[in-house]
Amino acid sequence: MGRLDELDLSVSLPKKKAKKRLRKEQRKLLALRLRLAGLVGSDAIGPPVCIVFEGWDASGKGGAIKRLVKQLDPRHVRVRSFSAPTDDEQRHHWLWRFWPVLPGWGGMAVFDRSWYGRVLVERVEEYAEPDAWQRAYTEIREFESMLVAEGTILVKLWIHISDEEQLRRFEARKDDPLKSWKLTEEDLRNRKKRDVYAEAVEDMLEQTSTTQAPWHLIEGDSKRFARLRVVETVNQAIEAAIGGGQNAKGS
């Protein structure tokens, strides 16, 4: 049994209660974000915040990100989605393309997919040679260790949904003309390899969940519950990192 099997995907909250708690957490995140930007309390800016979303296809990453940034000024957060590397990006070290979009002090970035594609899709689909993706675990740990050592608050989220829930969401997307664009042939193909992907995910969690950059597993069968848990988790990570505000740079 792996870490994913230990999650209780039946958890949920009544709609009214979940909505109330989500609004509260969104307001808390807004206050924290303004504080980190030096716009509330002190003009000293706080450390960078980098929030990484990974998860199954149709696990609700996009919806969770929308709720996460809903109360934030668009000037204060950068959302970036990553797909396959371009021809130019492939001419560089595979981590190179992530460097330009990492947040600086006082900044916040949200990544929909990330460098973890190296040990997930590139591993399973054999886009990367075995020695390359196996070496990537060490490269990722060192990369993240460097970011954290420089002050980055790194929050890594895996949104987990059951096989049955994923199928239900695929069917719903197929039947909705405003959502059908989200369902691709690649999604359907990946679903047939779910067991292989699950093995890759478990290896990823084991190899890259560290004390300084742990993975946070989000139970995702209930979208309301998952969205709340995401914002709560981000708030807790920021609060734990900045404490009483000692980690700040003067204006």
Listing of model-derived features with the role each one plays in the protein:
Residues P85-D88, S114-G117, H160-L167, D221-F225:
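Conserved nucleotide-binding/hydrolysis micro-motifs of P-loop NTPases
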Residues K193, A198-S251:
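NTP-dependent small-molecule kinase module
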Residues M1-R27:
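Charged, amphipathic alpha-helical linker segments immediately N-terminal to NTP-binding catalytic cores
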Residues S12, E122-E139, L147-E199, N247-K249:
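A glycine- and Lys/Arg-enriched "phosphate-lid" helix/loop adjacent to the NTP-binding pocket
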Residues R75-T86:
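Short beta-strand-centered segment that lines the nucleotide-binding/catalytic pocket of NTP-utilizing
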Residues P85-M146:
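P-loop NTPase motor core
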Residues L36-P47:
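Phosphate-binding P-loop
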Residues V52-V69:
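Glycine-rich phosphate-binding P-loop
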